[in-house]
Curated annotation (Swiss-Prot):
It comes from Treponema pallidum (strain Nichols). Residues 1-19 form the signal peptide. A lipid is attached at C20 (S-diacylglycerol cysteine). This is Putative DD-carboxypeptidase TP_0574. Gene3D superfamilies: Penicillin-binding protein Tp47, domain A, Penicillin-binding protein Tp47, domain B, Penicillin-binding protein Tp47, domain C, Penicillin-binding protein Tp47, domain D. GO terms for biological process: proteolysis. It holds the Pfam family PBP-Tp47_a. Changing C315A: Protein still binds ampicillin, in nonlipidated fragment (residues 21-43).
Length: 434
C-alpha cells in the first residue's frame, strides 16, 4: 500500500491511500458475538454442527435437548439475567401482566405475584453496560440501545409502557469475544456475528480468535503479556450435592497477582469482563501430565459469580451432561477467561461419590454417626446449618459414634448435616433435632 500526504489550506496533512488492491490482505480487530458452539468448536477441535446436534428427548421440565450448549436452562434463569446481560447474548421471554401484588418470600424478602395473559408474550434482548460501582456496592448500569436492562432480581420488564413477567431466559453465547477478521470476511462477520472494530483489540490480545471461514473461528491465542490488574488463585474449595444440580463444584477465590487482597471494585471489574471457563480433565493423574479430555462450559449453568463482596467464581460439573461426556471424579485444571486479563488457572480434585450408608442423629449438642466404618470417617468433618441461616457448626472433626458439637440444637427443628470425608465427596442429610 502506498501513502501520500496532501497539504490542506488550513495547514493540516491529509492522508491519501494509493493502490487499494492490497487492502484485501488487511486484518480487522474487534469484538464479535459468538454462540457457545461457535466459540468452543475451535477450542475443542469439533465441528459446530456436532456441538449443536440435539435429540428428541425432553428433560424433566419438558424442554427438548437442543445440543450440548442448549440455550434453555433453568439454572440460567435461577442465577439471574441481571448478571448475564453485561457479557452474554441474552433473550428474555415474558407474558403480559394484568395485575400484580407485592408479597414476601420465606426469607422475608419482597417479591411480586403476577396475574398474566399467557396469550400475549414478548421476546426481548436484555443487554446493559456497566457504568460504575456505588459506595454501597450497588452496580450502576445503563441499557444498551435497542435492548432492555434488567434490575437485580428483576421478575419483569417494560416495553412501550407495558409490563411483562419473565417466564424464560436464554443465554446464547458471549457478546465480546476478541477476534481478528480478514478483510474479505469483514462483511460476513458484521452480519452474522455482530462484529465491531475496537482499538483495544490487537494481534497481542489475550484470547484472540481468528475468523477462518464464514462460519468458523480458530482456537484462542494465549498471550503472556502482563497487566497491572491481573488476578491469580487464592484458594480453591470443593463442594458436592449442589442445589443447582452439579455433581461437584469448585469455589475459586481470587486475589491480586502480587498476593494482596482483591477489593470488591476490582472483583466487579473482573466479572464484568468474564467470559467462560475451560475444564481440562486428567483423570486420576495428580501430576497433571496426561490430559484425558477438554470441555467447554456455559456461564450460569456451569460457572457463576455473585454480586456480594466475596471474590469467588464458582465452577460446577454434571458428569451426565452431553458437553461433559467421559468426565468423572478426578483432577481438573480450570482456566478462567476474561477480556483484558491473563488467564487464571485453578487445579482441583473432585472426589468420588460415597456409595455406602450413613445414619445421622442430633440431640442436644450430640451428633451421632452410624453406618459408615471408622476408616471411612478418618479425618472427617461436619458442617451443620438450618436453611437460610449461618452455619452453627463449621469444619468440626467427627468420628464413628457420638460426637459433642459446639452448638445446641433446637428440638423439632430441621437441620442440614454435611459430612465431609477425606477420600469421598461429602454426604448431606436432613435431620430433625430431638
Amino acid at each position: 500500500m502506498k501513502v501520500k500526504y496532501a497539504l490542506l489550506s488550513a495547514g493540516a496533512l491529509q492522508l491519501l491511500v494509493v493502490g487499494c488492491g492490497s487492502s484485501h490482505h488487511e486484518t480487522h480487530y474487534g469484538y464479535a458475538t459468538l454462540s457457545y458452539a461457535d466459540y468452543w468448536a475451535g477450542e475443542l477441535g469439533q465441528s459446530r454442527d456436532v456441538l449443536l446436534a440435539g435429540n428428541a428427548e425432553a428433560d424433566r421440565a419438558g424442554d427438548l435437548d437442543a445440543g450440548m450448549f442448549d440455550a434453555v436452562s433453568r439454572a440460567t434463569h435461577g442465577h439471574g439475567a441481571f448478571r448475564q446481560q453485561f457479557q452474554y447474548a441474552v433473550e428474555v421471554l415474558g407474558e403480559k401482566v394484568l395485575s400484580k401484588q407485592e408479597t414476601e418470600d420465606s426469607r422475608g424478602r419482597k417479591k411480586w405475584e403476577y396475574e398474566t395473559d399467557p396469550s400475549v408474550t414478548k421476546m426481548v434482548r436484555a443487554s446493559a453496560s456497566f457504568q460504575d460501582l456505588g459506595e454501597d456496592g450497588e452496580i450502576k448500569f445503563e441499557a444498551v440501545e435497542g435492548a432492555v436492562a434488567l434490575a437485580d432480581r428483576a421478575s419483569s420488564f417494560m416495553v412501550d409502557s407495558e409490563e411483562y413477567k419473565i417466564t424464560n431466559v436464554k443465554v446464547h453465547g458471549m457478546k465480546f469475544v476478541p477476534v481478528a477478521v480478514p478483510h474479505e470476511l469483514k462483511g460476513i462477520a458484521k452480519e452474522k456475528f455482530h462484529f465491531v472494530e475496537d482499538s483495544r483489540v490487537t494481534e497481542n490480545t489475550n484470547g484472540l480468535k481468528t475468523m477462518l471461514t464464514e462460519d468458523s473461528f480458530s482456537a484462542r491465542k494465549v498471550s503472556s503479556m502482563e497487566s497491572p490488574h491481573d488476578l491469580v488463585v487464592d484458594t480453591v474449595g470443593t463442594g458436592y450435592h449442589s442445589r443447582f444440580g452439579s455433581d461437584a463444584e469448585a469455589s475459586v477465590m481470587l486475589k491480586r497477582a502480587d498476593g494482596s487482597e482483591l477489593s470488591h471494585r476490582e472483583f466487579i471489574d473482573y466479572v464484568m469482563n468474564f467470559n467462560t471457563v475451560r475444564y481440562d480433565y486428567y483423570g486420576d493423574d495428580a501430576s497433571y501430565t496426561n490430559l484425558m479430555a477438554s470441555y467447554g462450559t456455559k456461564h450460569s449453568a456451569d460457572s457463576w459469580w455473585k454480586t456480594g463482596r466475596v471474590p469467588r467464581i464458582s465452577c460446577g460439573i454434571n458428569y451426565g451432561f452431553d458437553r461433559f461426556k467421559g468426565s468423572g471424579p478426578g483432577y481438573y485444571r480450570l482456566t478462567l477467561i476474561a477480556n483484558g486479563y491473563r488467564d487464571v488457572v485453578a487445579d482441583v480434585r473432585f472426589l468420588p461419590k460415597y456409595e455406602g450408608n450413613i445414619d445421622i442423629g442430633l440431640k442436644g449438642k450430640v451428633l451421632t454417626i452410624g453406618g459408615a466404618d471408622a476408616e471411612t470417617l478418618m479425618d472427617a468433618a461436619v458442617d451443620v446449618f438450618a436453611d437460610g441461616q449461618p452455619k452453627l457448626v463449621s469444619d468440626q472433626a467427627v468420628s464413628l459414634g457420638q460426637n459433642v458439637l459446639s452448638a445446641d440444637f433446637t428440638p423439632g427443628t430441621e437441620y442440614t448435616v454435611e459430612v465431609r470425608f477425606k477420600e469421598f465427596g461429602s454426604v448431606r442429610a436432613k435431620v430433625v433435632a430431638q
